[in-house]
Amino acid sequence: MIKLYIISGMSGAGKSQALKIFEDFGFVCVDNIPIQIVADFIDICLKDSIRYKNVAISVDSRAGKSLTSFKDLLIVFKKKNIGYKIIFFNATDSVLLRRYSETRRRHPLGKSVSEGIKLERKIMDRIFTVADEIIDTSDLTIGELKKVISMLADICQSGKQYLNTSILSFGYKYGLPNDADIVYDVRFITNPNYVHGLKFKTGRDEAVRKYIERQKEFSVFFNIFSKLIETTLPGYIKESKSHLTIAIGCTGGQHRSVFTAEKLAGFLKSKKYKVKLNHRDILRHDN
């Protein structure tokens, strides 16, 4: 069986942000899906319940007159024994007006913002009255909203598993990585490139690993470096960051940065973090 969440509510109350949060939690998400095709879409999901195990769809006032058939859709779900939960996102009129003013966006119903809000409340009442959960986002931060959704959706994902940590080794001679959140330079380590027999090896090779680990400054550095990263990651999780890229660079991106990245990845995995490792320049061999 699939886990289905129907996201609805007032425009400007956080539906789009909520759908992004569901997506970060691994849900298959569809925004503003027409009511007429929801049943067919769910049938597709049921045929591949492994791939579509967790599904979140957004239905709102943009559906127009088709919203009149929303309750009929719920009857279809019940007949097919499809479990679902409707989450309605709401906010006070004053907060909605302020958010529209800040973003300078038009109301989707094409009226003035105040008129649009008033009309939308009438239209969305048919969903509001059948909602399983109503979330007032007037005073919620993004982090708080994420916690509320994780509880409502019964997502037992630890913060460590929520944060996707990418560790990237690179060579400065080929340029800085564009997507790095943190960049650390390990060119202070004696370069194995100039040691006989190590030039065409990489930081993955045992001989290179032993050469670097014998350097006292590396041991001191890595103890401090790993503790620094371990100390800061919970803060990123607290601030609701779902992706973090740590880039480690040396001259050519083959020896020192590769070994350090490998060692950091192993350290974080031992601490139960979800880690992806990539060596950008490991295959480049300039003479």
Swiss-Prot record:
This is Nucleotide-binding protein TGRD_433. Belongs to the RapZ-like family. GTP binds at D60, S61, R62, A63. Disulfide bonds: none annotated. ATP binds at G9, M10, S11, G12, A13, G14, K15, S16. InterPro entries: P-loop_NTPase, RapZ-like, RapZ-like_N, RapZ_C. Pfam families: PapZ_C, RapZ-like_N. Keywords: ATP-binding, GTP-binding, Nucleotide-binding. It comes from Endomicrobium trichonymphae. GO terms for molecular function: ATP binding; GTP binding. The keyword Lipoprotein does not apply. Displays ATPase and GTPase activities.
